[in-house]
């Protein structure tokens, strides 16, 4: 008899509306260059439609950022974001350094300083970055104290 394995649902994509002009050849190239260099994302080229659609593959075909053109695109006030979790502080620092290097070449890159929030059992390292998209991306690394982890906190 086969036992059923249960897993939690997980987020698999973020969909955002953007101005159609951002999805022209130049805009797509800029979006792909930045997000590719900082996060390692790639284009799903079979889905790309000029001035209509760009899908950024985020490490697997089941994780992606879906950018669709709209006459009324999303406009954030600065607090809207989605989060990425990395396994190590080194990964977080490397992403921040790549974003910082690109900010030096392009002032449109918005990047916060890295910070650490101390929750005693958890050191939460993070930064925010945004380039051309209507919302920011928060990169986080959870550094648990000995004897603690995300499972123990349930």
Language-model features, listed with the residues they occupy:
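Core segments of cupin and vicinal oxygen chelate
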Residues: 16-63
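Residues that cap or initiate secondary-structure elements
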Residues: 20-22, 62, 88-90, 135, ...
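A short, hydrophobic/aromatic-rich structural module that often spans a beta strand
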Residues: 44, 48-87, 91, 152-154
């Amino acid at each position: 008899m086969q036992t059923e394995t249960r897993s939690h649902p997980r987020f698999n994509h973020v969909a955002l509306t953007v101005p159609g002009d951002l999805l022209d050849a130049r805009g797509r190239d800029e979006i792909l260059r930045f997000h590719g260099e900082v996060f390692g994302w790639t284009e799903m080229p079979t889905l790309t439609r000029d001035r209509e659609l760009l899908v950024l593959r985020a490490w697997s075909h089941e994780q992606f950022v879906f950018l669709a053109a709209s006459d009324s695109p999303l406009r954030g006030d600065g607090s809207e974001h989605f989060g990425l979790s990395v396994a190590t502080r080194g990964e977080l620092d490397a992403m921040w350094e790549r974003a910082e290097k690109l900010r030096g070449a392009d002032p449109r890159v918005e990047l916060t300083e890295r910070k650490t929030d101390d929750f005693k059992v958890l050191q939460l390292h993070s930064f925010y970055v945004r380039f051309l998209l209507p919302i920011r991306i928060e990169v986080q690394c959870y550094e648990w104290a000995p004897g603690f982890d995300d499972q123990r906190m349930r």
